[in-house]
């Protein structure tokens, strides 16, 4: 087994020790297929996530579910975004990504509006974190570095925010 493969296996085992169910997919399309098959007839809330957009999960899941995606509602202004964000907190299922995950089985998220973090913590029948290998870091310190130097600046640029990290 390669060092790369060992790192992934070690991370999956750490998440299992922390009582998370973990699935691994060789291709992004397989992950999207899995979620589309698993989630049917539900109200589904989304946290703001480029990962979910890249997998076309909104389009895939809305075929058999009612999907609430605050960024899509946000085109109607901040009030529409906030209303959809509150509604997403009351759904059966919640999907989001993470800014970073550690090899120790920890999830790191920094959230501007709070809707992603709030949605990940309470109330849903199921919560799915959809993360790519690009989010994997050795430890919390590396995760914080990833947030400060990769995730937050990209998010600020995408949203046109003039935050210190976006410079």
What is the role of each PLM region?
Residues 89-167:
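Conserved phosphate- and dinucleotide-binding cores of soluble alpha/beta proteins
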Residues 4-95:
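N-terminal active-site beta-alpha-beta segment that forms phosphate/nucleotide-binding
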């Amino acid at each position: 087994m390669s060092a790369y493969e060992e790192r992934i296996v070690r991370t999956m085992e750490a998440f299992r020790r922390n009582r998370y169910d973990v699935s691994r997919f060789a291709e992004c399309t397989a992950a999207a297929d899995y979620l589309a098959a698993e989630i049917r007839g539900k109200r589904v809330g989304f946290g703001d996530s480029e990962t979910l957009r890249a997998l076309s999960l909104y389009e895939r899941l809305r075929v058999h579910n009612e999907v609430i995606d605050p960024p899509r509602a946000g085109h109607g202004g901040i009030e529409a975004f906030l209303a959809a964000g509150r509604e997403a907190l009351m759904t059966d299922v919640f999907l989001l990504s993470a800014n970073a995950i550690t090899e120790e089985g920890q999830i790191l998220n920094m959230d501007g509006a709070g809707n992603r973090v709030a949605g990940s913590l309470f109330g849903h029948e199921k919560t799915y974190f959809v993360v790519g290998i690009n989010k994997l870091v050795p430890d919390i310190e590396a995760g914080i570095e990833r947030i400060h130097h990769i995730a937050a600046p990209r998010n600020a640029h995408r949203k046109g925010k003039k935050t210190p990290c976006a410079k």
